[in-house]
Amino acid sequence: MWRGRAGALLRVWGFWPTGVPRRRPLSCDAASQAGSNYPRCWNCGGPWGPGREDRFFCPQCRALQAPDPTRDYFSLMDCNRSFRVDTAKLQHRYQQLQRLVHPDFFSQRSQTEKDFSEKHSTLVNDAYKTLLAPLSRGLYLLKLHGIEIPERTDYEMDRQFLIEIMEINEKLAEAESEAAMKEIESIVKAKQKEFTDNVSSAFEQDDFEEAKEILTKMRYFSNIEEKIKLKKIPL
């Protein structure tokens, strides 16, 4: 106890034992620099501090901020970076974000905030659509791992697969009845379900080459799905 009191007296009188390091008080400049690494609000200049991921508005002046260019779609939509996505949760997050950043809510705000709301809304729409569909979600996940599939490529597809695609396309071209169309739709739907299950397993095992091959096949069948939709539209 005496040593504690003695130490307190030494601190009050301005003395300190030789060889014992003293804590230097944080200067005003140092204190201000502590937040200099954080992004600052374009409107008031205030620092955001940690936890920016969930902030769209400045905590000081409540001005809408610019979208974070480093944030990926999974983070934005509050999803794990995985091929398996809870689509109900994804839709809820989409609606939540649009209630925050949709341009309709910024008609009376500054032009800067109007521009930011347009960018946010577009980004949220793109993220939602990309993560909702298995094919676009898989391609995006591959891209995050540094792998991209060119738009027009056979990606060394085996001959048997290409023959299968050709035969389905021929059946579609010749289909004249509703029953024939439904049969082709059923085949394509079953194939896409099989591919979706397989690519999910490939991602879980970090087998990106396998995922790349399956996604390429999914893209072929996605093209057939689009042709089916077009053929259903009455001319």
UniProtKB/Swiss-Prot annotation:
GO molecular function: ATPase activator activity; identical protein binding; metal ion binding; protein-folding chaperone binding
GO cellular component, as recorded: cytoplasm; cytosol; mitochondrion; nucleoplasm
Pathway: Cofactor biosynthesis; iron-sulfur cluster biosynthesis
Keyword GTP-binding listed: no
A UniProt-annotated Pfam family: HscB_4_cys
InterPro entries: HscB, HscB_4_cys, HscB_C_sf, HscB_oligo_C, J_dom_sf
UniProt key word Magnesium: no
Keywords of the record: Chaperone, Cytoplasm, Metal-binding, Mitochondrion
Gene Ontology biological-process entries: [2Fe-2S] cluster assembly; iron-sulfur cluster assembly; primitive erythrocyte differentiation; primitive hemopoiesis; protein complex oligomerization
Residue ranges annotated for the J domain, each copy included: 72-144
Binding sites annotated in the UniProt record for a divalent metal cation: C41, C44, C58, C61
Tissue: Expressed in lung, brain, stomach, spleen, ovary, testis, liver, muscle and heart.
Listed PANTHER family: IRON-SULFUR CLUSTER CO-CHAPERONE PROTEIN HSCB
Disease: Anemia, sideroblastic, 5: A form of sideroblastic anemia, a bone marrow disorder defined by the presence of pathologic iron deposits in erythroblast mitochondria. Sideroblastic anemia is characterized by anemia of varying severity, hypochromic peripheral erythrocytes, systemic iron overload secondary to chronic ineffective erythropoiesis, and the presence of bone marrow ringed sideroblasts. Sideroblasts are characterized by iron-loaded mitochondria clustered around the nucleus. SIDBA5 inheritance is autosomal recessive.
Family classification: Belongs to the HscB family.
Protein name: Iron-sulfur cluster co-chaperone protein HscB
Species, as recorded: Homo sapiens (Human)
